[in-house]
């Protein structure tokens, strides 16, 4: 019998326990032996839980029990999760996690520890929730050089933007609905709406693609707080919708660029039709071309099912599972991983007349004049040109309120 421990009994942790209980026979068949939860570590009081005898508060109980083969980490964050996971791997126990912050920050180190101590560190649920993407990318696409990853990886902001488009809601109203439905945190939704969640996910995928650690702090990140109903309407005039896009590109010289930003997505682009809490990630390989991974990116049971699938793999294959899943440690780079390539942009400028905006930004057209300024579509510019234009706007008493890159019509 394989005995496991669960660290954290919040949304995902309780989901993992539920999946293991409801589908016990199926999980055991796939693992090749019965699977049993022996401990659940959580500081809260679960004395009224039907399985209260499983709950413990001392991590050392798990570490000192030789029967524990696999540890599931669903605490989140890094303060407790990182030292606990590190200790488990150093003791030769495999770890399965959904913790994107920990993987994005310490992935290379933890993968190295797993390899050193003959166990596995698995994190399928950290990027796509219940939608598989880590395993397909490093196994099914192993014959490809991946040059680009681009997609919608945060279900909360995608739900909010869908509401803003379909129901003409403002940011605050869309956020309130997302919170009422449990898609956004009630106390502090900033990880989602400010893009940090998406940033961690694209950092993980970038590390996987590039073979060395790419850190979230080096990825330019903007969220959706600045998006207004007027921007949504202007996007419609341009034949686009607004989506929060996470992306990375790898040049032929090995250079890496990455970012998280709200973008104009033309309706002909397949990402434009990805709505509500669904995610979609487009991966470009040199041999296969484009592959899209699509599904619900979050949710208790979808995410838990991905974690349990990792548990099965760890039990069945041990240190051999996904042994090619590895990237090298690296120091954070100086500066940001920006993309120098030119693109079309939507800019919203306040405080100066449309004619002045047109004179500053050059070739393009006014989209909306309802502001004390205007919304302007720039046909072609790079980040350096946009920064120079912003300085000129400020020099004449204006301010740039929003900049949105337009994606190509076809991926």
Label every PLM stretch briefly.
Residues 175-273, 278-280:
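Substrate-binding/catalytic subdomain of NAD(P)-dependent oxidoreductase enzymes
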Residues 311-411:
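A conserved regulatory-domain signal marking ACT and ACT-like small-molecule sensing domains
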Residues 146-150, 158-161, 165, 183-190, ...:
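Catalytic, metal-anchored helix/loop core of enzyme active sites in primary metabolism
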Residues 81-87, 91, 100-138:
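Rossmann-fold NAD(P)-binding glycine/threonine-rich loop
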Residues 68, 115-197, 204:
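Rossmann-like NAD(P)H-binding beta-loop-alpha module
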Residues 34, 188, 192, 213-221, ...:
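Flexible, glycine/charged-enriched surface loops at secondary-structure junctions
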Residues 1-91:
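N-terminal glycine-/serine-/threonine-rich beta1-alpha1-beta2 phosphate-ribose binding loop
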Residues 94-96:
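A short hydrophobic/small-residue beta-strand
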């Amino acid at each position: 019998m394989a005995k496991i421990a669960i660290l954290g009994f919040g949304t995902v942790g309780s989901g993992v326990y539920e999946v293991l209980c409801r589908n016990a026979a199926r999980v055991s068949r796939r693992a090749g032996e019965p699977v049993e939860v022996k401990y659940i570590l959580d500081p809260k009081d679960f004395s009224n839980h039907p399985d209260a005898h499983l709950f413990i508060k001392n991590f050392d109980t798990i570490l000192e029990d030789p029967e524990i083969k696999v540890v599931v980490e669903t605490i989140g964050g890094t303060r407790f999760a990182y030292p606990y996971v590190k200790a488990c791997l150093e003791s030769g126990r495999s770890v399965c996690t959904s913790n994107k912050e920990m993987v994005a920050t310490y992935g290379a180190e933890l993968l190295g520890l797993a390899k050193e101590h003959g166990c596995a560190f698995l994190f399928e649920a950290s990027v796509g929730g219940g939608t598989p993407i880590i395993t397909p990318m490093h196994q099914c696409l192993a014959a490809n050089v991946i040059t680009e990853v681009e997609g919608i990886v945060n279900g909360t902001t995608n739900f909010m933007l869908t509401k803003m488009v379909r129901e003409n809601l403002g940011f605050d109203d869309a956020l309130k609905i997302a919170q009422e439905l449990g898609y956004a945190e009630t106390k502090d939704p900033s990880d989602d709406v400010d893009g940090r969640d998406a940033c961690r996910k694209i950092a993980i995928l970038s590390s996987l693609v590039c073979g060395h650690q790419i850190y979230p702090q080096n990825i330019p990140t903007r969220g959706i707080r600045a998006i207004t109903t007027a921007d949504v309407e202007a996007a419609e005039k341009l034949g686009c919708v607004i989506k929060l896009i996470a992306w990375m590109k790898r040049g032929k010289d090995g250079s890496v660029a990455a970012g998280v930003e709200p973008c104009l997505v033309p309706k002909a682009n397949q990402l434009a039709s990805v709505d509500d809490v669904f995610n979609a990630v487009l991966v470009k390989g040199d041999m296969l071309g484009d592959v899209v991974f699509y599904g619900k990116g979050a949710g208790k049971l979808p995410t838990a099912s991905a974690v349990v699938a990792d548990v099965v793999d760890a039990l069945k294959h041990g240190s051999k599972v996904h042994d090619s899943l590895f990237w090298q440690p690296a120091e954070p780079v100086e500066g940001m991983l920006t993309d120098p390539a030119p693109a079309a942009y939507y800019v919203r400028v306040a405080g100066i007349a449309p004619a002045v905006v047109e004179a500053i930004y050059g070739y393009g057209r006014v989209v909306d004049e309802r502001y004390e300024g205007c919304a302007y579509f720039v046909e072609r510019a790079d980040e350096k040109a946009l920064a120079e234009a912003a300085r000129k706007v400020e020099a004449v008493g204006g301010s740039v309120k929003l900049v949105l890159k337009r994606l190509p019509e076809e991926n």
